[in-house]
C-alpha cells in the first residue's frame, strides 16, 4: 500500500501558487526561495548553515533515493528553512541508510513539499530572481500562503552569522571520512588555526584537521584580541548565511588580522567579509549560485575547476583596493570568485573548496593556507 501524504502549498511573493503534498512537518515556513542544481548531497545541503532562512528547491527530480544517516551532516541540525522537490521515491536504499528522508524531515521539524513542477519553479526564479516564499503544509489556503510569503523581510540587511554561530569556543580534531574507516582523528597537529564560526560546515573543519591543523572554533562575535590570545598560526573565516554588511564585528576583527600579517583564509561569507575589511563593497545577486557543478577559472595558472557554490551575495571586484589581486572568476557569469592581497598573507574564495556535496577540485586552497602558516612559523 502506497503511503498517503497531507496536501501542501508553495506560494511565492509574486502570487504564484504550486500545489503538492507534504513530506515533512505540519505547519508553515517562510524564507527566500532558491534553487540548487546538485544531483546528490541533499542531507549536506539541508544541514548547511548557509541556507538559514532559505527554502531550497532541488532541481534534480528524484530526491531521497539513499535515505539519510547520522554521518553525512554539516551541522548539529537542519538549517534550511524548508525543502521543495519534485518526487520522493517510495523506497530508499543504501548500505549506510538509517532513515528515510521524510522521516528525517519530520524528526527535524522541517516543512517540505513534493509533487510540484520544479522545472517551472526554477524558470521563474531564474527569470525573476530569488523570491520570498511560503510552504504551507496540511492546509489548502493559497491566500494565507501568499500573505505569509510577502511577510518575509528578505535577506538584505539580515545578520544571520551571529544567529547560527556557536556561543562557546570548542576544539576540533576530526579528519575526513574514508570507506571502511569512517572519520579519523588528528592527533599530531603542526598548526593551530582559530576558525570563526559564521555558520561553519563540518567538512571545512575536517579538511583543516586533515592537513595537520589543530582547530579552535570561536563564536562569530569573538574580538581579534580574544582570537589572538589563542596564539594561532592562522585565522580561518568560515562560510555562513545572510548579508555580510551588518557583520561589523567580523569586518573589524578581519582588518586587525590583516594588519598584523596573520595568515588569513576566508570562504563564502568569510570571503565577503574579507572583501569588506579591505574596503570593498558587496551586492545582492539576482539568483545567487547554488550547486555542485560551477566552473571557475584560476587566473594564476589558467586552469578551469569545477566547484560547489552556495551564496546569494558577491564582492564587487571594481571596489577592491590596488593591493587586492583577483585570482578566480566564475565562468557562468563572470562574478568574482577569489582574490588575494599582494602585501599580506590573506586570500579568500567565494565557493566551497570543501564541497560536501560536490567536487574537491579546489581543495588546494587549504594546502595554500597551511603553506602560508608554515612560512610564518619559519
Swiss-Prot record:
Active-site residue list: 268, 352, 354
* Entry keyword annotation includes RNA-binding: no
Pathway membership: Amino-acid biosynthesis; L-arginine biosynthesis; carbamoyl phosphate from bicarbonate: step 1/1; Pyrimidine metabolism; UMP biosynthesis via de novo pathway; (S)-dihydroorotate from bicarbonate: step 1/3
Q: What PROSITE patterns has UniProt attached to this entry?
A: GATASE_TYPE_1
Which reaction is catalysed here?
Answer: hydrogencarbonate + L-glutamine + 2 ATP + H2O = carbamoyl phosphate + L-glutamate + 2 ADP + phosphate + 2 H(+)
Span list, region CPSase: 1-188
For the protein in the UniProt heading, the enzyme class is ligase
Q: Which InterPro entries match?
A: Anth_synth/Amidotransfase, CarbamoylP_synth_ssu, CarbamoylP_synth_ssu_N, CarbP_synth_ssu_N_sf, Class_I_gatase-like, CPSase_GATase1, GATASE
User: What's a single GO BP term from this record?
Assistant: glutamine metabolic process
Superkingdom, according to UniProt?
Bacteria
Q: Show the GO MF annotations.
A: ATP binding; carbamoyl-phosphate synthase (glutamine-hydrolyzing) activity; glutaminase activity
EC number of the protein: 6.3.5.5
Q: Which positions are annotated as binding L-glutamine? A: 50, 240, 242, 269, 272, 310, 312-313
Glutamine amidotransferase type-1 domain spans which residues?
Answer: 192-378
Pfam families assigned to the protein according to its UniProt record, in alphabetical order: CPSase_sm_chain (PF00988), GATase (PF00117)
- Quote the subunit structure annotation: Composed of two chains; the small (or glutamine) chain promotes the hydrolysis of glutamine to ammonia, which is used by the large (or ammonia) chain to synthesize carbamoyl phosphate. Tetramer of heterodimers (alpha,beta)4.
PANTHER family xref list: CARBAMOYL-PHOSPHATE SYNTHASE SMALL CHAIN, MULTIFUNCTIONAL TRYPTOPHAN BIOSYNTHESIS PROTEIN-RELATED
Q: Which family is this sequence assigned to?
A: Belongs to the CarA family.
Q: What is this protein's function per UniProt? A: Small subunit of the glutamine-dependent carbamoyl phosphate synthetase (CPSase). CPSase catalyzes the formation of carbamoyl phosphate from the ammonia moiety of glutamine, carbonate, and phosphate donated by ATP, constituting the first step of 2 biosynthetic pathways, one leading to arginine and/or urea and the other to pyrimidine nucleotides. The small subunit (glutamine amidotransferase) binds and cleaves glutamine to supply the large subunit with the substrate ammonia.
Annotated protein name in UniProt: Carbamoyl phosphate synthase small chain
